[in-house]
Amino acid sequence: MEKILVTISTGAASFAVLAVLFTIPSLYNTINEVHDEVLDGVSVFRVETDSAWTEMMDIQITVTPPTKPRVNPFNSIFRQKRQTFSGLPAWCQCEPTKPTCPPGPPGPPGQPGQPGTPGAPGPKGEDNTSTYAPITCAPVSQDCVKCPQGPAGPEGPAGPAGPAGPDGQPGAPGNAGNPGSDGQPGAPGDDGQPGAPGQDGQPGAPGQDGQRGSGAPGAPGAPGNAGPAGPAGQDGAPGQDGQPGPAGPAGQDGAPGNAGSDGQPGAPGGPGLPGNDAAYCACPPRSAVFVSRH
């Protein structure tokens, strides 16, 4: 029985070793194929992202010209802290871009935490040694509860009108009134008829001769009406040229001209250094040097 178990175990172990020997080369080839596919995909992704970034930079340069980078005015006063990146390869010795964006809004409150561990039990309380007088309750009354008088209610509506009273006694006669005031004078009467004409009087005696007057001449009379227009005169000689007037205000600026044509593409850069396995460092952000090349 033991020989049979040893034989079966030996056969199973031999089969497992043979299966591993046949599986390892296939697994190694599969890993190499996956590695090559990943490298090809990363290369294609780099080419596509670089081309997309180049197009975006060309569009941005066409629409808005590049501006000068912002310079901190305190850099010349305060010394910047040095940073060391000795742990990175030689081609990664570059200072990372410092974030200049303002902090974002605070995030939503997190989930409530787990309940804390229960505290240690407190010390045992002291025994009560004081005594109290017995409490005697008043006897419960069986009479009805007398509530206090409530506030006055609202005023009721007005009642109906009562019957008419009897007529009163006649009053005493009044005193005589005062005489009235004089009225306004009346309007004047109409004019009477004209009287009959009287008789002609006797002619008067002839008057004495008058003195010849020697008064000053009267004021000149008003000017007469304008006479007809005379014939047109000959044209006068041309006058001399006047002095030149002051310079007018400057005109408005003209519209901006059309954008210039794109420059010639720069020479391609040299190939980069190969990276170590599992030590690929992140690509630096696009800088002004990259924009100037493209």
UniProtKB/Swiss-Prot annotation:
* Gene3D superfamilies to which the protein is assigned, alphabetical: 6-Phosphogluconate Dehydrogenase, domain 3 (1.20.5.320)
As one GO molecular function, the record gives: structural constituent of cuticle
Q: Where is the composition biased (Low complexity)?
A: 164-209, 219-265
* GO CC entries: collagen trimer
Region: Disordered; residue ranges are 100-134, 148-278
Q: Where is the composition biased (Pro residues)?
A: 100-112
SMART domains under this entry? Col_cuticle_N
Domain of life the protein comes from = Eukaryota
Q: Quick one: where's region Triple-helical region? A: 102-127, 153-274
Chain's role:
Nematode cuticles are composed largely of collagen-like proteins. The cuticle functions both as an exoskeleton and as a barrier to protect the worm from its environment.
What quaternary arrangement does the UniProt entry report?
A: Collagen polypeptide chains are complexed within the cuticle by disulfide bonds and other types of covalent cross-links.
Protein name per Swiss-Prot or TrEMBL: Cuticle collagen 144
Lineage here is: Eukaryota, Metazoa, Ecdysozoa, Nematoda, Chromadorea
